[in-house]
A protein has these predicted regions:
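Walker A (P-loop) ATP-phosphate-binding motif of ABC ATPase nucleotide-binding domains
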Residues: 3
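Hydrophobic anchor at the beta1->P-loop junction of P-loop NTPases
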Residues: 6
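The conserved Walker
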Residues: 10
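Conserved glycine(s) of the Walker
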Residues: 13-14
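Hydrophobic positions on the alpha1 helix immediately C-terminal to the Walker A/P-loop
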Residues: 17
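Short basic/glycine-enriched coil/helix segment immediately N-terminal to the Walker B
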Residues: 49-59
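Hydrophobic residues in beta-strands of the RecA-like P-loop NTPase core, especially within AAA+ ATPase
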Residues: 61-63
Length: 97
């Protein structure tokens, strides 16, 4: 699993960049919704990622993620094979400004 963290100050185009990734995936025939990270607790956020992996998804898109959510995902990636996440799965996370 790979993590792409999109950072920046307010109004710097982070969400626009995430939407561009979504459109690029859509052009490839891959439909991926954008979830709003701040609406979920960190454990539930991790469960959302796990659910997507189990469903066979290859990408996860999230806007307005807390630094705790991003750290938790990075910790999951650091576990490597123990986390049982496919290396082809990519999480695109926009950090809250």
């Amino acid at each position: 699993m790979r993590v792409n963290v999109i950072k920046g100050d307010r109004c710097t185009g982070k969400t626009t960049q995430l939407q561009a990734i979504q459109e690029e995936l859509k052009a490839q025939g891959i439909e991926v919704p954008i979830i709003i990270g701040e609406r979920f607790t960190t454990p539930y956020f991790l469960n959302l990622i796990s659910d997507q992996v189990l469903a066979g998804a290859t990408h996860f898109l999230a806007d307005d993620c807390t630094q705790f959510q991003i750290k938790a995902v990075q910790d999951l990636v650091a576990q490597g094979r123990n986390a049982r996440l496919p290396i082809t799965f990519i999480a695109h996370l926009v950090r809250q400004a």
